Amino acid sequence: FVDKVEVPPAEFSSVLRLPSTDFQKLCRDMSNLSEEIDIKSSGNQLEFTVSNDWVDQTTVIKESVNNGMAYIQNLSPDEVIQGSFSIKKLVMFSKCTNLCQNIEIYLKNDYPIIIKYSVANLGEVKFCLAPKNND
């Protein structure tokens, strides 16, 4: 079931580039542990956290030339930007991995996450996923 929601224009606090294969592997691996993933950007690092009754797992990716993760925009490096999202939906989005080498992740507090795949000369594919409510 898909809801059509109007998303107002916004300036994102954090925009980063990450290898698409790393994002796909991370989402697939963590989807075995939980239905929800917390994504947090703080300083020069990105954290992916899942938890359930038996296990907590956090994967931290620091900005580095070697691992391919880089901030394109980081308006407030001291601000913590985070949200909880459906990992099942992120795994579905990651099926576009073969379209490009790197993805862009747009993050802002209390706002949907946007994942952008640039497809060579054809354009781009953007996926938007609203944060999960804790209600």
Question: Residues of each region from the PLM?
Answer:
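DNA polymerase processivity clamps
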Residues: F12-V65, N74-D135
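Short acidic, glycine/tyrosine-flanked loop/strand segments centered on an H-E-D-like triad
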Residues: F1, E63-A70
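Structured all-alpha helical bundle cores of eukaryotic regulatory proteins
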Residues: F1-V15
